[in-house]
């Protein structure tokens, strides 16, 4: 039976640690994506899908972008709602394999690169925490440092938080599992695919 190459074993191990991210894996002058990530990125960005010998009988699906010009590609993926993990080469070699590590995760609400920012609008990340009788929320634009925190204990929590989401227009929402239950009753989440809840 064929066996994966050491580099591909490391890639898959890293991908297991970041399953919800598109993994930009640095190989020389390119960030490469493999397997499902390559298929997704190829489709979303209209890049050529190729293959790489990986130790298996079939070549691994692969696509890539130049490391010196990766920002526009990441920006397009972020705008489509994806998270991107940037995996860089280190100076270490172990068993003749260049070591790599994830140095950054870019999400719609954590963009700070001026190349990827739209200067005419804020880039808010919002957190919602729902308990039995109240809802708390915080939002921040990490590119400017603006931040706000509030709590609401009144009636009709669903309408209240819906109004706040529409007013703030966050690029990303993170929430606890109780707040996730609001997803089915918040009109803004039903009608605008921009708003996505990430449960933590």
Residue positions per predicted region:
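Basic, polar low-complexity surface loops/patches
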Residues: 1-200
């Amino acid at each position: 039976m064929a066996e994966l190459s050491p580099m591909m074993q490391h890639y898959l191990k890293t991908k297991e640690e970041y399953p919800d991210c598109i993994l930009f894996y640095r190989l020389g002058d390119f960030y490469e994506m493999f397997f499902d990530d390559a298929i997704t990125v190829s489709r979303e960005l209209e890049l050529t899908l190729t293959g790489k010998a990986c130790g298996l009988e079939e070549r691994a699906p692969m696509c890539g972008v130049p490391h010196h010009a990766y920002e526009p590609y990441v920006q397009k993926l972020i705008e489509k709602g994806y998270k991107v993990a940037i995996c860089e080469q280190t100076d270490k070699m172990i068993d003749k394999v260049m070591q790599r590590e994830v140095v950054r995760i870019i999400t719609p609400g954590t963009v700070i690169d001026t190349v990827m920012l739209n200067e005419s609008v804020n880039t808010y990340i919002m957190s919602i925490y729902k308990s039995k009788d109240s809802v708390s929320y915080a939002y921040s634009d990490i590119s400017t440092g603006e931040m706000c925190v509030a709590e609401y204990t009144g009636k009709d929590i669903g309408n209240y938080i819906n109004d706040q989401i529409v007013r703030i227009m966050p690029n990303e929402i993170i929430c606890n599992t109780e707040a996730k239950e609001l997803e089915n009753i918040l009109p803004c989440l039903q009608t605008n695919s921009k708003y996505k809840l990430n449960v933590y």
